[in-house]
Amino acid sequence: MDSNFHYSIDLNEDQNHHEQPFFYPLGSSSSLHHHHHHHHHQVPSNSSSSSSSISSLSSYLPFLINSQEDQHVAYNNTYHADHLHLSQPLKAKMFVANGGSSACDHMVPKKETRLKLTIRKKDHEDQPHPLHQNPTKPDSDSDKWLMSPKMRLIKKTITNNKQLIDQTNNNNHKESDHYPLNHKTNFDEDHHEDLNFKNVLTRKTTAATTENRYNTINENGYSNNNGVIRVCSDCNTTKTPLWRSGPRGPKSLCNACGIRQRKARRAAMAAAAAAGDQEVAVAPRVQQLPLKKKLQNKKKRSNGGEKYNHSPPMVAKAKKCKIKEEEEKEMEAETVAGDSEISKSTTSSNSSISSNKFCFDDLTIMLSKSSAYQQVFPQDEKEAAVLLMALSYGMVHG
């Protein structure tokens, strides 16, 4: 079975020449010539490069190519060089010569395969690549032949995007011409000035409100919201930070008058307390009455003076013991004199006067000699009474 190969050669050396495909079968020259007449294609006589390429290809492929599908080889002169692109892998079987002889055995392939070769050449070498041309210019025939619909869509999108970018750049340049560079800084400065002005106004308003509030407080009294004007009953003032209670009721005195009157009340109470203590201490020594009247007066003072007695309990006990001692002395004087009341009064008066003049030792000797005193009080109570008498004597005459 013969194997046919499809070669397509495109030579653009001259403008009058067009693409002409060529088909060459692999094998002898007769089969190649027969296949050439079968497809009715002719090779230009003035194209030396095409004939040389065909002869080189025919001499370069001394083997058969087997594949399950048709193979397409595109030979393009895009970067001023010929490149061979194979779309699918090829399976080949080499024919090995027997003993280096010129004759070779021909093997029949299982399936007919074709190989297509396309050769294109630029008119001018210095012509730029069609993809690098200006997108604003209209597309040429070569661009249309090379580009697929997808490539045309991509190119159109790129062109539109570039036009939009150029338009925005032009608008930005125009705006920059209308507005100088320092416009932004001037706007920021104006904004800061507005903020500072607002802050100053707020502070002034707050200060005015606070001042009005303080004036209202000072005029109507401290935090007086009822509208009632108070007047001090002592100094007749209406402005005070605090109102105090006075003789005319609560909040009838100003702060200064209330403090002054409170101090005066405390001083009067202290003076009264001191005078009461002094009267209690001096009253038993004011008068010396006869014996019976004196005892009655002392009892009355002791009973009525307990309210004003602020002395410690030891002093009160000493006074009671002293009263009992005087009673015992009177009883002794009655037993010794026993004659008349006159002698009794004289002895009592003499004993009271002598008690003030006697020393402590004489008083103890006198008490020890009295039998009535020893009968009434035991020894320890007697010693306690003597000590209390000594203490009271020192307090009165000290």
Swiss-Prot record:
Belongs to the type IV zinc-finger family. Class B subfamily. Transcriptional regulator that specifically binds 5'-GATA-3' or 5'-GAT-3' motifs within gene promoters. Involved in the modulation of chloroplast development, growth and division in a cytokinin-dependent manner. Repressor of the gibberellic acid (GA) signaling pathway that represses flowering and modulates greening, in a SOC1-dependent manner. Prevents the accumulation of SOC1 during flowering. Promotes chlorophyll biosynthesis throughout the plant, by regulating chlorophyll biosynthetic genes (e.g. HEMA1 and GUN4) and chloroplast localized glutamate synthase (e.g. GLU1). CDD domains: ZnF_GATA. It is found in: Nucleus. Residues 343-353 have a biased composition (Low complexity). One of its GO terms (molecular function) is DNA-binding transcription factor activity. The gene is GATA21. Residues 20-51, 122-144, 289-353 are annotated as: Disordered. Residues 32-42, 291-302 have a biased composition (Basic residues). Disulfide bonds: none annotated. Induction: Activated by gibberellic acid (GA). Negatively regulated by AP3/PI. Strong accumulation during cold imbibition of nondormant seeds, but not at warm temperatures. Regulated by PIF transcription factors. Induced by cytokinin (e.g. benzyladenine). Repressed by HAN. Inhibited by SOC1. Down-regulated by auxin (2,4D) and auxin response factors (e.g. ARF2 and ARF7). Its main location: nucleus. Pfam families: GATA. This is GATA transcription factor 21. Interacts with SNL1. Forms heterodimers with GATA18. Disruption phenotype: Pale green leaves and reduced chlorophyll levels associated with altered regulation of sugar-sensing genes (e.g. HXK1, HXK2, STP13 and PLT6). Reduced chloroplast size. Faster seed germination. Early flowering. Increased leaves size. Reduced gibberellic acid (GA) levels due to increased GA turnover and associated with reduced expression of GA-anabolizing enzymes (e.g. GA3OX1) but increased expression of GA-catabolizing enzymes (e.g. GA2OX2). Small seeds with deformed seed coats. The double mutant gnc cga1, lacking both GATA22 and GATA21, exhibits reduced sensitivity to cytokinin (e.g. GO terms for biological process: chloroplast elongation; chloroplast organization; circadian rhythm; cytokinin-activated signaling pathway; gibberellic acid mediated signaling pathway; glucose mediated signaling pathway; negative regulation of flower development; negative regulation of gibberellic acid mediated signaling pathway. A motif (Nuclear localization signal) lies at residues 109-116. Expressed predominantly in leaves, and barely in stems, flowers and siliques.
